[in-house]
Regions:
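Helix-loop-helix
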Residues: 2-283
Length: 283
């Protein structure tokens, strides 16, 4: 119940971030646009996140000679920084994914038993499981909390960066949306959009794939037949990817590039975190 309340609080805060990010103006941020000017015309959110991101894209695009690589480098730096800042939270999240089969067994055990005593026993068993693996359920919420405002800031940054507005990739401007690219038959931009969807799908399915591989190995170890459990969150998982694809089709392709690279970094992070979690579990 505490977790549900925590999610509700986070949802309200994240919505405020979204409204703040979406309410900003989209005037161009060039290399010579000062922080003080942004502070005068915008607000704290723009000064802290949007201006630095836009200027980082401008600088790196100028340095590499390509707005494509400018966005890629900014994305990698952002994601590596987030991984370092939220290392413990990511580790908690990975552990939570690892124990999902055991949690589902407990929930299935008490399925249909809504009396207070049964719910209390289920809660105690789940708490014992968290304690066994040294997991704080709320600790896994920090990483998503930090990532969302960055995404909103990046949305504004790519719409205002002079490098994105005036630069091109293979002769195409990344300021165009995938929807516009489809109408104009700008295929390289559509490739970025499709790659983003595929990378995002792999990213969200990676924890389940890891658990499946581990469960198969465990079954073979004990000479048992592996039965793939039903995934109660399958609709949510695929629904989230569809929702992201729907949103991104109307946002600049530069943001699809950002999300694509972020998903690749997240895939690598998931694998590394799983290795660390497995080593800790063996101790």
């Amino acid at each position: 119940m505490k977790i549900n309340r925590k999610w509700k609080i986070m949802a309200v805060v994240l919505m405020l971030f979204m409204l703040t990010g979406c309410s900003t103006d989209f005037s161009e941020i060039a290399m010579d646009t000062s922080l003080s000017k942004v502070m005068e015309t915008g607000g704290l959110f723009e000064a802290i996140l949007i201006w630095p991101l836009a200027q980082a894209i401008n600088y790196l695009a100028n340095w590499t000679g390509s707005v494509f690589w400018g966005i890629v480098l900014v994305t990698v730096v952002i994601n590596v920084a987030l991984v370092l800042l939220t290392f413990k939270s990511n580790l908690q999240m990975q552990k939570m994914n690892t124990i999902q089969p055991e949690l589902q067994k407990i929930q299935k055990k008490y399925e249909g038993r809504d009396d207070q005593a049964s719910q209390m026993r289920m809660s105690n068993e789940m708490q014992a499981l968290y304690k066994k693996y040294d997991i704080n359920p709320l600790g896994s919420l920090i990483a998503p909390f930090l990532q969302f405002p960055i995404l909103i800031a990046m949305y504004s940054a790519v719409r205002r960066s002079s490098a994105v507005l005036n630069g091109t990739f293979l002769g195409y401007t990344l300021a165009l949306t995938p929807k516009e690219a489809f109408v104009n038959k700008d295929w390289p931009l559509l490739v970025i959009y499709v790659a983003m969807i595929l990378c995002q799908l792999v990213s969200v399915l990676m924890p389940q794939l890891i658990n499946k591989i581990k469960a198969k190995k465990e079954a073979e170890k004990h000479h048992k037949h592996y039965e793939e459990p039903k995934n109660p969150n399958a609709m949510i998982t695929y629904g989230m990817v569809i929702f992201i694809a729907f949103i991104m089709i109307s946002w600049p392709t530069a943001l699809s590039l950002y999300y694509c690279i972020s998903s690749v970094v997240n895939i690598i992070k998931t694998i590394v975190m799983q290795i660390i979690a497995d080593k800790q579990a063996e101790k």
